[in-house]
Amino acid sequence: MDLEAKVKKMGLGHEQGFGAPCLKCKEKCEGFELHFWRKICRNCKCGQEEHDVLLSNEEDRKVGKLFEDTKYTTLIAKLKSDGIPMYKRNVMILTNPVAAKKNVSINTVTYEWAPPVQNQALARQYMQMLPKEKQPVAGSEGAQYRKKQLAKQLPAHDQDPSKCHELSPKEVKEMEQFVKKYKSEALGVGDVKLPREMDAQGPNRMYIPSGDRSTPAAVGAMEDKSAEHKKTQYSCYCCKQSMKEGDPAIYAERAGYDKLWHPACFVCSTCHELLVDMIYFWKKGKLYCGRHYCDSEKPRCAGCDELIFSNEYTQAENQNWHLKHFCCFDCDNILAGEIYVMVNDKPVCKPCYVKNHAVVCQGCHNAIDPEVQRVTYNNFSWHASTECFLCSCCSKCLIGQKFMPVEGMVFCSVECKKMMS
């Protein structure tokens, strides 16, 4: 497919998850409705990952595409219908007999993902070493956590130009080259094994003999004995704590087999979240999730959340923006040359700020313009003017004066306070 055809095919899946309830806003959100170019809900401004959207097939397609044309093709299968690669995630079902008074019942636990190892006991041990709230048991908080991290750590728009908004043919080509490069140089999947199983593959680690020190004359006599008792000492690359014998460890091939991690320590060096499904990106001695690896390579638009492949973009408030996406977060009007106010790290135009976000003056009960001076005490604000910041009893101007605040009112003296009580 040529570039022009690819560009024409691009578009965001606006019907996907439509109407799904927001897990964060609850009934305050009318249901998920994807913004035209932002990756958020138009109704509540939360991301799709915060909504109860059924995305298992879509996520499996996304990860399958990530592994396409890599050494990890064993983790994908192509659908016969359309040839699209699908992620063959390992689902683990454990059955535990539960003794009852009269008979024995079976308690079944399903993990929506588990490390693809033949030894189920090892996989189970791996899961038990994760925080309980992050264990991907079907229907649990941990399963929701995994779903959220899949969306956050591995955005589809970081690897698939068709998931981006209005890329030019030149930008499509640059993105494809970028994806090809990180697949060959950084992408990896962790491997769960017992540390001693890797001795044959990895370089020799430090050996600590049972004896402490010996004289040269005694070395020969002690050599055989120390060889029998010496043990390999392993430590976690992240927390530097020692690994317990018999506990599973995670290896990252790109990092080298002289490094290993506790299951709970295999995290992104930027966001410090568990690397979802052990999918990592390795760069300069650090582990990254997909999102933060890409952030270390390319600027990301704070408006649409996509990587910027254009040479022309703007920087404002320590963030990067496509020129067309430096817009008001409320009304989407372009802010170039306009007055704006940052609200929760999002730029808002002056009219929208006054309408939706401005604090109300306790004196005149009107919104306080963002460019106007104000007086603030606790959660109350006043225009810093002789008409608004007055004693609630005698109307004396309190600018530059001591005052006594009482539940949204201010007084110039104890006497005035008593008169109003």
Curated annotation (Swiss-Prot):
<dbReference type="InterPro" id="IPR034958">
    <property type="entry name" value="LIM1_Testin"/>
</dbReference>
<dbReference type="InterPro" id="IPR034960">
    <property type="entry name" value="LIM3_Testin"/>
</dbReference>
<dbReference type="Pfam" id="PF06297">
    <property type="entry name" value="PET"/>
</dbReference>
<dbReference type="GO" id="GO:0005737">
    <property type="term" value="C:cytoplasm"/>
</dbReference>
<keyword id="KW-0862">Zinc</keyword>
<dbReference type="InterPro" id="IPR047120">
    <property type="entry name" value="Pk/Esn/Tes"/>
</dbReference>
<dbReference type="GO" id="GO:0008270">
    <property type="term" value="F:zinc ion binding"/>
</dbReference>
<feature type="domain" description="LIM zinc-binding 3">
    <location>
        <begin position="362"/>
        <end position="421"/>
    </location>
</feature>
<dbReference type="GO" id="GO:0008285">
    <property type="term" value="P:negative regulation of cell population proliferation"/>
</dbReference>
<dbReference type="InterPro" id="IPR010442">
    <property type="entry name" value="PET_domain"/>
</dbReference>
<protein>
    <recommendedName>
        <fullName>Testin</fullName>
    </recommendedName>
</protein>
<dbReference type="GO" id="GO:0005829">
    <property type="term" value="C:cytosol"/>
</dbReference>
<dbReference type="InterPro" id="IPR033724">
    <property type="entry name" value="PET_testin"/>
</dbReference>
<feature type="compositionally biased region" description="Basic and acidic residues">
    <location>
        <begin position="155"/>
        <end position="164"/>
    </location>
</feature>
<dbReference type="GO" id="GO:0005886">
    <property type="term" value="C:plasma membrane"/>
</dbReference>
<keyword id="KW-0677">Repeat</keyword>
<comment type="similarity">
    <text>Belongs to the prickle / espinas / testin family.</text>
</comment>
<keyword id="KW-0963">Cytoplasm</keyword>
<dbReference type="Pfam" id="PF00412">
    <property type="entry name" value="LIM"/>
</dbReference>
<comment type="function">
    <text>Scaffold protein that may play a role in cell adhesion, cell spreading and in the reorganization of the actin cytoskeleton. Plays a role in the regulation of cell proliferation. May act as a tumor suppressor.</text>
</comment>
<feature type="domain" description="LIM zinc-binding 1">
    <location>
        <begin position="234"/>
        <end position="297"/>
    </location>
</feature>
<dbReference type="InterPro" id="IPR001781">
    <property type="entry name" value="Znf_LIM"/>
</dbReference>
<dbReference type="GO" id="GO:0005925">
    <property type="term" value="C:focal adhesion"/>
</dbReference>
<feature type="domain" description="PET">
    <location>
        <begin position="92"/>
        <end position="199"/>
    </location>
</feature>
<feature type="region of interest" description="Disordered">
    <location>
        <begin position="133"/>
        <end position="164"/>
    </location>
</feature>
<keyword id="KW-0440">LIM domain</keyword>
<dbReference type="GO" id="GO:0032991">
    <property type="term" value="C:protein-containing complex"/>
</dbReference>
<dbReference type="InterPro" id="IPR034959">
    <property type="entry name" value="LIM2_Testin"/>
</dbReference>
<feature type="domain" description="LIM zinc-binding 2">
    <location>
        <begin position="299"/>
        <end position="359"/>
    </location>
</feature>
<keyword id="KW-0965">Cell junction</keyword>
<keyword id="KW-0479">Metal-binding</keyword>
<comment type="subunit">
    <text>Interacts via LIM domain 1 with ZYX. Interacts (via LIM domain 3) with ENAH and VASP. Interacts with ALKBH4, talin, actin, alpha-actinin, GRIP1 and PXN. Interacts (via LIM domain 2) with ACTL7A (via N-terminus). Heterodimer with ACTL7A; the heterodimer interacts with ENAH to form a heterotrimer.</text>
</comment>
